[in-house]
Each structure stands twice: as structure tokens, then as C-alpha cells.
Design a protein with these regions (language model features):
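Helix-start/capping segments and mature chain N-termini
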Residues: 3-7, 22, 27-213
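Ordered, amphipathic secondary-structure segments that act as subunit-interaction surfaces
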Residues: 12-21, 28
Length: 213
């Protein structure tokens, strides 16, 4: 794998290296081969330029009418079977939102279209339980490791109408505050200062973990 990655790396200092590891062609009827023919696909991408302004100014978030199925065997894992996310992104493209809150089929908040969610109520930070759906992103886990007071809960979409602040996180955007939250006919301005403060408090730990801010 290291040889494949080394051969694909361009002479650049910053970007996104995507590595997909597959089990190769399987048998009939979804059966896996006893000894899979593992393949590795590598691609290089630029970091989306919009992320820097998102981090500083915040984004507009709403909802989409696509839910995630509950499947505890896959919950938390980042895998290549992401058909639901394709439907979510298609629905998002028909809105004016930068991203959307995504629930499971029981209306529990899970994540955003390609990021994890955190929200602030009464001075306490919360994030969604991913026991039955969603992806436990590396940035989410980094935040939880360094902020042990964050509560992991099951939360219905209807119960977050009065949050004080909210942010999205993933490995590329890191931490992005939500500037406005639209739920149905209700649109609210959220505070971004608590998010910026949290992001700043994690900067030293982030450099220690990943070597760059």
C-alpha cells in the first residue's frame, strides 16, 4: 500500500490523498472469496478553497427529506457503500443551504451530509450517538478525545430548535460553525463565537496530533 501511495503522491505540500481499499471481485450472490484479491485505488485532490471562509464566517444549514437507515453492523464505519449520501447530496443541491442535518428513520439526529455535528445548549456541548447509523469521523473522535465533557446523546430533530450554537466537523474542514439554522419555517441566527473559541482551544492539540493547523 505504501508503494502505491508513494507513486501517486504529486510534488505538492498540501492536498487530500484519498485511499480506497477493496476486496476485489467477489463470488456470485454477494459471496466473498475465501482469499480476496485486494485492490488499492489512490487519488489526489485539492482542499476545497471554501473551507477557510466557512471556518471564519460560518455556514447556512437546514434539512433534507432523506434519512439514514439504521444498521448497527455498519454504524460508525467509513465504507464505500454510501448510496444514501448520494441521495442526500442530490437533495441538498436543490436547496440554498451549505449543508444539512441528516436524521435516521426514527428522526434522531445523526450527522451532516459529509460531516459530524455538535451543538451547544446552556453551556454544554453535545454530539449524536452513532450506535445505529452514521460515520465516526476522525475529527469527531479527535474532538471527543480532547473534550471529555461533550455528551453523546440521542436527540430528535424537533428538540434542537433552541440550540445556542452548532458546528460541523470532518478531517478536511476541521471545525465549521453554523451561522443560520433552518428547521421547517423557522430560521435562526446562531452564535459562532463559542465555536471559534472551542476551535482555538484545540489548536495546540491538533498540531501535536497531526503536525499542522
Amino acid at each position: 500500500i505504501r508503494q502505491v501511495i508513494a507513486a501517486a503522491l504529486p510534488e505538492r505540500n498540501e492536498g487530500v490523498l484519498k485511499v480506497l481499499i477493496g476486496a476485489g471481485q467477489g463470488g456470485r450472490g454477494y459471496a466473498r472469496l475465501a482469499k480476496p484479491n485486494i485492490n488499492v485505488a489512490v487519488s489526489w485532490h485539492d482542499v476545497p478553497a471554501v473551507y477557510q471562509s466557512w471556518q471564519q464566517q460560518g455556514i447556512h444549514v437546514g434539512t433534507v427529506p432523506v434519512s439514514l437507515a439504521r444498521q448497527p453492523l455498519l454504524a460508525g464505519l467509513k465504507h464505500a457503500n454510501r448510496l444514501e449520501q448520494i441521495f442526500i447530496k442530490q437533495a441538498l443541491a436543490h436547496t440554498d443551504f451549505d449543508d444539512a442535518i441528516v436524521t435516521d428513520t426514527e428522526q434522531n439526529i445523526i450527522e451532516a451530509s459529509a460531516a459530524n455535528l455538535f451543538w451547544l445548549v446552556g453551556g454544554q456541548w453535545f454530539t449524536s450517538s452513532l450506535a445505529l447509523a452514521g460515520v465516526n469521523g476522525v475529527m469527531r473522535q479527535f474532538i471527543l478525545d480532547n473534550c471529555p465533557d461533550i455528551h453523546i446523546i440521542e436527540q430528535q430533530l424537533t428538540e434542537i430548535a433552541h440550540v445556542d450554537a452548532m458546528f460541523l466537523s470532518n478531517a478536511l474542514m476541521q471545525i465549521v460553525p453554523v451561522k443560520t439554522l433552518t428547521l421547517g419555517e423557522s430560521k435562526r441566527e446562531l452564535a459562532i463565537a463559542p465555536v471559534l473559541s472551542l476551535h482555538k482551544s484545540l489548536a495546540q492539540a491538533y498540531v501535536g496530533e497531526y503536525g499542522a493547523a
